Amino acid sequence: MAKKSLNETSPVARFEQSLEELEQLVQKMEVGDLSLEQSLTAYERGIGLYRDCQQTLEQAELRVRLLTDPARPELAEAFEPPSLDG
């Protein structure tokens, strides 16, 4: 079977790939070895990846809301993750 391209992979796989690439870009930028042009290019790419991840998360939240109450998804309460403070 042929390998799937990025556009044919699942939203979860694309999200994970985007997040991994974003983390790698952040690490490169934090080291500080990039030129100004490279930093700007990395920043621009990072913003695009961030927006892709954010959109995927918003779509996932909508799916959860639709599954929770298909008749009235707008009334579903927003998911609040548990606090890690203890």
From Swiss-Prot:
GO CC, alphabetical: cytosol; exodeoxyribonuclease VII complex
Major subcellular location class: cytoplasm
Tagged with keyword Cytoplasm: yes
Tagged with keyword Ion transport: no
Gene3D superfamilies: Exonuclease VII, small subunit (1.10.287.1040)
Compartment list: Cytoplasm
Domain of life: Bacteria
Catalytic activity: Exonucleolytic cleavage in either 5'- to 3'- or 3'- to 5'-direction to yield nucleoside 5'-phosphates
EC top class named in words: hydrolase
GO molecular function, one term: exodeoxyribonuclease VII activity
Keywords annotated in UniProt: Cytoplasm, Exonuclease, Hydrolase, Nuclease
Subunit structure as annotated in this protein's UniProt entry: Heterooligomer composed of large and small subunits.
Family (UniProt): Belongs to the XseB family.
Annotated protein name in UniProt: Exodeoxyribonuclease 7 small subunit
Organism of provenance: Xanthomonas euvesicatoria pv. vesicatoria (strain 85-10)
Gene name of the encoded protein: xseB
